[in-house]
From Swiss-Prot:
The gene is MNP1. It is found in: Secreted. Gene3D superfamilies: 1.10.520.10, Peroxidase, domain 2 (1.10.420.10). Its EC number is 1.11.1.13. It is an enzyme of class 1 (oxidoreductase). This is Manganese peroxidase 1. It comes from Phanerodontia chrysosporium. Catalyzes the oxidation of Mn(2+) to Mn(3+). The latter, acting as a diffusible redox mediator, is capable of oxidizing a variety of lignin compounds. Binds 2 calcium ions per subunit. Binds 1 heme b (iron(II)-protoporphyrin IX) group per subunit. Its main location: secreted. It catalyses: 2 Mn(2+) + H2O2 + 2 H(+) = 2 Mn(3+) + 2 H2O.
Length: 378
């Protein structure tokens, strides 16, 4: 696939970093003195919120990076929003109350204290850097580019700029194009984030419903499992933005898998189906594609040439598990619903077991893993 050759070139170019030119107070050598402030911030985020895990608190901050950045519109102009500008944190009683941001108040309230503690760092930089640190805890994730120097925004974004799971593919693609000229390939690439994501508000009867069977690992399972025949719902049925899932079984806090209507639609639309299918069992390709698309998303509203490359202070992510994509137990090739005849589907094995396995609620496999939740204005 031509996309894969292009992404491989981009990944190689991104690996070439400038030689360190500054020494931070802790002795770390970095490419620019301005990057030093992010070293204690990363440590603070890990110790206070993430605990070095790809858990719910990390998932929520990764979601925040997208919701903060996509709030920009080329057609509506500057009054609509400033993109990756930290406005979620700066206007916590405004944007978190938009329906598309339902549930984002947790991550907003968790990050607000860091604005005071690390007050040389803008809210805009805090959001994107926190997301990069959060993602580094997810095995298989790429090390994201991080550019520092975004100024804070002085106005909140308007409502209606965040894509929602009930939106049509046409509306989603138009929104991304209007936000920053994103291509369908880049849109699907960004949805690799759903491999480490869960939903709390789509179905109000359940919490932390994962989008694939491995929600604590950045892998291609989500691209496989969205292509499997839906058989039920993890909670109640007929929720806006949700369609039947192939793995709805849950027990206690181990919630069954949820399938978003928008993911299902993108996996089958002629404009995006082959892109979606092409990520199945292509871990390195998916990770590199996501990194490239995130590099574009994270600077919406800014001139990247005016920012400082501080990628060298982003923690090195945990390595991939090495586990290939597999059909979950109780499913197999007979359950595939494919919409791309031109993309060869890989030969995959099936996990052992005659019935669906429960999806663990916590990274360590347990049912109880209390998260961090600060009180705040959002």
């Amino acid at each position: 696939m031509a996309f894969k050759s292009l992404i491989a070139f981009v990944a190689l170019a991104a690996a070439v970093r400038a030689a360190p030119t500054a020494v931070c107070p802790d002795g770390t050598r970095v490419s620019h003195a301005a990057c030093c402030a992010f070293i204690p911030l990363a440590q603070d985020l890990q110790e206070t919120i993430f605990q070095n895990e790809c858990g719910e608190d990390a998932h929520e901050v990764i979601r925040l990076t997208f919701h903060d950045a996509i709030a920009i519109s080329r057609s509506q102009g500057p009054k609509a929003g400033g993109g990756a500008d930290g406005s979620m944190l700066l206007f916590p009683t405004v944007e978190p109350n938009f329906s598309a941001n339902n549930g984002i108040d947790d991550s907003v309230n968790n990050l607000i204290p860091f604005m005071q503690k690390h007050n040389t760092i803008s809210a805009a930089d805090l959001v994107q850097f926190a997301g990069a640190v959060a993602l580094s805890n997810c095995p298989g994730a790429p090390r994201l580019e991080f550019l520092a120097g975004r100024p804070n925004k002085t106005i909140a974004a308007v409502d209606g700029l965040i894509p929602e799971p009930q939106d049509s593919v046409t509306k989603i693609l138009q929104r991304f194009e209007d936000a920053g000229g994103f291509t369908p390939f880049e849109v699907v690439s960004l949805l690799a984030s759903h491999s480490v994501a869960r939903a709390d508000k789509v179905d109000q009867t359940i919490d932390a419903a994962p989008f694939d069977s491995t929600p604590f690992t950045f892998d291609t399972q989500v691209f496989l499992e969205v292509l499997l025949k839906g058989v039920g719902f993890p909670g109640s049925a007929n929720n806006t933005g949700e369609v039947a899932s192939p793995l709805p079984l849950g027990s206690g806090s181990d919630t069954g898998e949820m399938r978003l209507q928008s993911d299902f639609a993108l996996a089958h639309d002629p404009r995006t189906a082959c892109i979606w299918q092409g990520f199945v069992n292509e871990q390195a390709f998916m990770a590199a594609s996501f990194r490239a698309a995130m590099s574009k998303l994270a600077v919406l509203g800014h001139n990247r040439n005016s920012l400082i490359d501080c990628s060298d202070v982003v923690p090195v992510p945990k390595p991939a598990t090495g586990q290939p994509a597999m059909f979950p137990a109780s499913t197999g090739p007979q359950d595939l619903e494919l919409s791309c005849p031109s993309e060869r589907f890989p030969t995959l094995t099936t996990q052992p077991g005659a019935s669906q396995s429960l999806i663990a609620h916590c990274p360590d496999g347990s049912m109880s893993c209390p998260g961090v939740q600060f009180n705040g204005p959002a």
